[in-house]
């Protein structure tokens, strides 16, 4: 529904976008398997746990122009980051940030996106973007009155998206439908992730697209 509002240009000029992923992964989680928390086999809070939220940066808001990131290993005994912050400028001129940590006490707290524009403000929160918490636009639509009926409860921070994804893959392979995403969309997210890591290591702003 948020994607629909963006496509309908209900926000007018996009001003600010913020994504928060405040989850927890104790040291015991990483100790369960040798590959967890490694560069070679896993990736950190950005590449692993928050990767789908990175997807939202381009899928919802559009092409990114610049990324400035800081990452750190603040508490866990792992190779990769347990916490990261990103400052982002989109080609549209919108500014935003992404805050990710796997150190939230005592349990998973929030997976959210807030979009602020010239004519509208929306926050989709909950533990895994499963609750529309704020929905205000100057230009009303019929579907606004039922908007909060889209909310649902989930026991998992990953929601139920995996089941629907695999169903789409199977249906596509059987020729019954079209794919909901493709490799090009995945590359956009991967490029953003690489830019964040490059920025974190260099301390500099990294512009997109990257040289390939």
What are these regions (language model features)?
Residues 53-54, 165-167, 193:
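A general structural signal for well-ordered alpha-helical segments in protein cores
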Residues 90, 112-184, 206, 212:
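C-terminal glycine/acidic-rich active-site capping loop/insertion
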Residues 1-78, 203:
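Predominantly a Rossmann-like dinucleotide-binding segment in NAD(P)-dependent oxidoreductases
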Residues 66, 74, 85, 90-94:
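Glycine-rich, aromatic-lined ligand/substrate-binding cores of catalytic
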Residues 51, 76, 99-107:
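Glycine-rich phosphate/pyrophosphate-binding beta-alpha loops
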Residues 79-83:
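A short, glycine/Asx- and small/polar-enriched loop/turn
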Residues 3, 58, 87, 166-170, ...:
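Non-transmembrane alpha-helical segments in soluble domains
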Residues 192-202:
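Short arginine-rich
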């Amino acid at each position: 529904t948020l994607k629909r509002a963006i496509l309908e240009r209900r926000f007018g000029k996009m001003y600010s976008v913020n994504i928060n992923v405040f989850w927890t992964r104790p040291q015991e989680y990483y100790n369960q398997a040798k590959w967890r928390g490694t560069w070679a086999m896993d990736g950190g809070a950005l590449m692993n746990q928050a990767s789908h939220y990175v997807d939202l940066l381009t899928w919802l808001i559009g092409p990114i122009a610049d990324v400035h990131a800081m990452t750190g290993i603040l508490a866990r005994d792992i190779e990769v980051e347990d916490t990261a912050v990103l400052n982002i400028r989109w080609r549209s001129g919108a500014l935003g940030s992404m805050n990710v940590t796997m150190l939230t006490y005592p349990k998973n707290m929030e997976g959210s996106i807030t979009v602020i524009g010239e004519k509208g403000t929306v926050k989709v929160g909950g533990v895994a973007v499963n609750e529309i918490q704020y929905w205000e636009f100057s230009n009303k639509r019929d579907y606004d009155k039922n908007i909060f009926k889209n909310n649902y409860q989930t026991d998992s921070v990953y929601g139920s998206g995996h089941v629907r994804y695999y169903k789409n893959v199977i249906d596509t392979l059987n020729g019954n439908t079209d794919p909901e995403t493709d490799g090009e969309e995945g590359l956009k997210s991967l490029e953003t992730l690489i830019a964040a890591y490059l920025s974190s290591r260099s301390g500099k702003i990294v512009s997109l697209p990257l040289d390939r």
